[in-house]
Amino acid sequence: MYSRREFGRLALVGLPMTVALAQGAARVNSKVNGVRIGIQSYSFRSLSLDEAIKAMAGIGIGECELFSGHVEPRVGPPGGAPGARPQQGGAEMTPEMREAMREARRKQQEETRKWRLSVPLEHFKDVRKKFAAAGIRLQAYNLSFNDNFTDDEIDRGFQMAKALGVKLITASSTLSAAKRVAPFAEKYKITVAMHGHSNLTDPNQFAKPESFSAALAMSKYFAVNLDIGHFFAAGFDPIAYIEANHARITNLHIKDRKKENGPNTPWGQGDTPIKQVLQLLKQKSYKIPANIEYEYQGEDAVAEVGKCFQYIKDSLA
């Protein structure tokens, strides 16, 4: 579901999008002073795929890292699409509530697995056509391989990426899952970029530079999808990391967080060096897409993403 403000804003951008879909659209150019700017479609998690595409075109963003929740069926509550990230906040849960949630999640995972293994690949080709008609380049498919994936499910994920016409999968994965994914990346010759968060206590998670290094050593088809907000909140310097590893960074997630594992914030209110990272991309001419990822809580996703894009423009002026 989406808010009234989002609905109103989509109505404004919907007419030109309708015309574009009917006539074909010129490629949307969202480069800012030579820096490639895209979006993680998770930013529009409250919108359907068609609504998200309309929003991207209306804002003027021409590259998309496609969140799997936008193409897979929503078998859970709003915001709980397959592959969705857990939401923060809420009342303390009882043990019974936690067990009920675990059972619901198990059922959801099984339903999603059945769908992944049976859905015609034409579904993904149709998604590809929608982006092409809107003039938006599909940059990557965000499918987070985890330890619950079967081998058939992993293989199918690469088939989905091929049907979408992308050569990159981004994944919030684990080191143990990455070992199983590596042979499939080699088989399909599709790059898998590991996305990190800020969990420093679990060595199986991607958070520390050492975790990324371990994955990079597994396959030449493994790379890094660096989330500068999470990386900084975990206590690491994204600028130094990008300079040292830019050759194996496929794309960035741009967001603002407070230091010392602090919360997501509206851009400019946290501690993440967003402007400095963008300036680095510009000055070094790194061809690394900087993808907006709107993750803090706001009332209107479309308006907030527009603010994020303007922040980028101002930072690169």
Question: What annotation goes with each model-predicted range?
Answer:
Residues 57-72, 185-190, 194:
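Conserved long hydrophobic alpha-helices within structured protein cores
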Residues 2-38, 45-62, 71-100, 206-209, ...:
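Histidine-acidic metal/acid-base catalytic patches
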Residues 64-66, 138-141, 170-171, 289-292:
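Short beta-strand segments at enzyme active-site cores
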Residues 102-122:
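A short acidic, glycine-rich active-site loop
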Residues 62, 69-74, 84-88, 118-128, ...:
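Active-site anion-binding loops
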Residues 43, 67-68, 142, 196:
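Residue-level recognition of beta-strand->loop/alpha-helix junctions
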Residues 40-41, 115-116, 145-146, 169-170, ...:
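A generic structural signal for short
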Residues 12, 16-17, 29-31, 51, ...:
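Active-site acidic/histidine proton-transfer and metal-coordination neighborhood
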